[in-house]
Design a protein with these regions (language model features):
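Long, highly charged low-complexity segments enriched in Glu/Asp and Lys/Arg with interspersed Ser/Thr
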Residues: 96-99, 204-248
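Extended serine/threonine-enriched, polar tracts that run as long, contiguous segments within proteins
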Residues: 142-219
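OB-fold ssDNA-binding interfaces and closely related basic DNA-contact patches used
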Residues: 1-158
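Generic surface-pattern signal
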Residues: 49, 53, 180-187, 219, ...
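Generic detector of well-ordered alpha-helical segments enriched in charged/polar residues
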Residues: 7, 41, 45, 176-183, ...
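Intrinsic-disorder-associated interaction segments
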Residues: 37, 78, 168-171, 175, ...
Length: 248
C-alpha cells in the first residue's frame, strides 16, 4: 500500500470518528446496583420489623478538613480513603444549627436546630434570625454563626443501605446548581448516578478547604428508577434527626 492510499484511508477514518455522535449518558441503562437488582427492599423491611430508621444507623461521611481531597468512608475494617463517591442520591436535607458557645465540646447538642434551613425546631423563621447574618460568627470574618450544610442520602453500587454525606456550606451552592441543571433537563436527582469529587481551595483568609463537585455519569432505566422511588419511601419514613458536631 503506497503512502497516498494510506493517508487517504487514515483521513477517511478520522472524518468518520469526528462525524460520529458522542456517547450520550442521557440514554437510560441498567446500572447493576445491588440494591436495585435483588430482594434488598424486602430484606430491609423484614429485618427492621416495622421499626423506623434513625440517624445513628447510617454511616456518615464528613467534609475532609485542611483542604484534603480524599473522603474518609466508614467500612467493615474501619475508615477507608476514597478519592470519589459514586451513587444515587435518593434524597437530601438542608439542615442548619447554632451553638451559643463559640467552642462547644464535640457531640454537644446545638442551641437551635432547623432541618430545612427555613424554620427552626421552635417555629422561628431562619431568614429573620441575626445568627443567619454574614459576620455574626465571632472570630471569623463574614461567617455566619448558624452553621449550614447539605445532607445527602447516597445509595452506592455495593450497598443496600444509603450512605450519609455531609456537604459543607462552602459547597452548598455547587450542589444546588447541579440539581438545577438536572431540572433544566426534566431529570429527577434520584434518576441519575452522581459522582462526587473534591478540589482543594483556599478561603479569603488563606485557609485551605475542600470544594465538592457533582457530575451525572449515568441515567437509570425505568425499572431501576421505580425501585429507587421505593427506597425513597423508606428514607422519607426514617426518623432522621441530624446529629451536629462543631468539629466536622
Amino acid at each position: 500500500m503506497d503512502a497516498t492510499n494510506l493517508k487517504t484511508r487514515m483521513n477517511t477514518k478520522v472524518q468518520a470518528m469526528e462525524a460520529a455522535p458522542p456517547e450520550d449518558l442521557w440514554n437510560p441503562s441498567d446500572s447493576g446496583y445491588l440494591a436495585l437488582s435483588s430482594n434488598a427492599l424486602d430484606l430491609i423491611k423484614e429485618n427492621l420489623k416495622q421499626q423506623s430508621l434513625s440517624f445513628q444507623l447510617f454511616d456518615l461521611v464528613k467534609s475532609p478538613s485542611g483542604g484534603s481531597t480524599v473522603f474518609s468512608v466508614p467500612g467493615l475494617s474501619g475508615e477507608e480513603a476514597e478519592k470519589e463517591l459514586t451513587g444515587i442520591i435518593l434524597d437530601y436535607m438542608t439542615p442548619r444549627a447554632y451553638w451559643a458557645t463559640p467552642d462547644p465540646v464535640e457531640g454537644t447538642p446545638p442551641t437551635c436546630l432547623s432541618k430545612d434551613s427555613l424554620i427552626s425546631a421552635d417555629g422561628k423563621v431562619c431568614a429573620h434570625c441575626p445568627f443567619n447574618d454574614f459576620g455574626s460568627k465571632d472570630g471569623e470574618s463574614n461567617a455566619k454563626a448558624c452553621k449550614e450544610s447539605v445532607l445527602l442520602f447516597l445509595l452506592r453500587p455495593g450497598s443496600v443501605f444509603p450512605l450519609l454525606v455531609r456537604v459543607p456550606v462552602t459547597s452548598k451552592k455547587l450542589f444546588l446548581k447541579y440539581t438545577t441543571r438536572l431540572v433544566s433537563r426534566l431529570t429527577p436527582l434520584s434518576s441519575v448516578v452522581t459522582k462526587i469529587t473534591l478540589e482543594k481551595a483556599t478561603s479569603r483568609e488563606g485557609k485551605p478547604y475542600a470544594l465538592f463537585h457533582f457530575d451525572a455519569v449515568e441515567v437509570l432505566g425505568s425499572e431501576e428508577a421505580e425501585k429507587v422511588r421505593e427506597f425513597m419511601d423508606i428514607v422519607h419514613a426514617a426518623d432522621v434527626e441530624p446529629v451536629f458536631t462543631e468539629a466536622d
